[in-house]
């Protein structure tokens, strides 16, 4: 299986050669740039639109990182703050005109129907990345992957939200590992890239990209 990692730390190059697995994606969070950490040109910059307060601000970020490929992450049905205040339709002109944007993640995907609008509107050269955040999504994983229109298939796992959904559903805590293993096995068998978060950056001062 090919696994990509989201990294929030500066010292990450030594993490990419692990056993016999070759990692194709090096993705770093936009929030690291608020602390003067430089994003290497061969690294993909992930822009979580929950932390981007306007379309203009997104344009500014793209302008500041012309040499990087971009991974946009659009929160859908997000309850916890912060949250974006614009729609997919607001983003389409930017997405369609930018050669930097290579990936577009959609949160809370639980069925193929959740991707329908994005498949219709997002340019076909951009890889759609369903975010897997619930047991329902994992149970429907084959159907979800089958509708991704690009040859490259990528999924993004949110461990915290998956665990929260398991607790909310009243399921045994042990199911957490079972669901993750089911997802990993599926990706392994079907040559699907699975993005998982490793590394956290801590600071005594919060600097949000929307400040």
Go through the PLM ranges and name each one.
Residues 2-211:
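Expand to "…catalyze enediolate/carbanion chemistry for C-C bond making/breaking, isomerization
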């Amino acid at each position: 299986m090919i696994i990509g990692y989201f990294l929030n730390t500066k010292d990450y190059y030594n993490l990419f050669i692990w056993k016999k697995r070759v990692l194709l994606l090096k993705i770093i969070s936009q929030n690291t740039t608020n602390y003067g950490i430089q994003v290497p040109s061969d690294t993909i910059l992930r822009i979580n639109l929950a932390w981007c307060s306007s379309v203009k601000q997104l344009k500014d970020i793209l302008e500041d990182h012309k040499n990087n490929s971009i991974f946009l992450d659009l929160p859908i049905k997000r309850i916890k703050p912060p949250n974006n205040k614009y729609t997919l339709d607001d983003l389409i002109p930017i997405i369609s005109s930018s050669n930097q944007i290579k990936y577009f993640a959609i949160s809370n995907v639980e069925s193929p129907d959740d991707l329908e609008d994005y498949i219709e509107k997002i340019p076909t050269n951009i890889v759609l990345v369903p975010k897997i955040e619930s047991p329902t999504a994992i149970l429907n994983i084959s159907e979800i992957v089958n509708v991704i229109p690009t040859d490259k298939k990528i999924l993004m796992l949110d461990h915290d939200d998956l665990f929260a959904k398991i607790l909310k559903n009243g399921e045994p805590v042990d199911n957490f590992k079972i669901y993750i293993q089911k997802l990993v096995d599926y990706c392994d068998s079907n040559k699907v890239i699975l993005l998982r978060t490793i590394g956290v950056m801590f600071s005594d001062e919060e600097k949000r990209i929307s400040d």
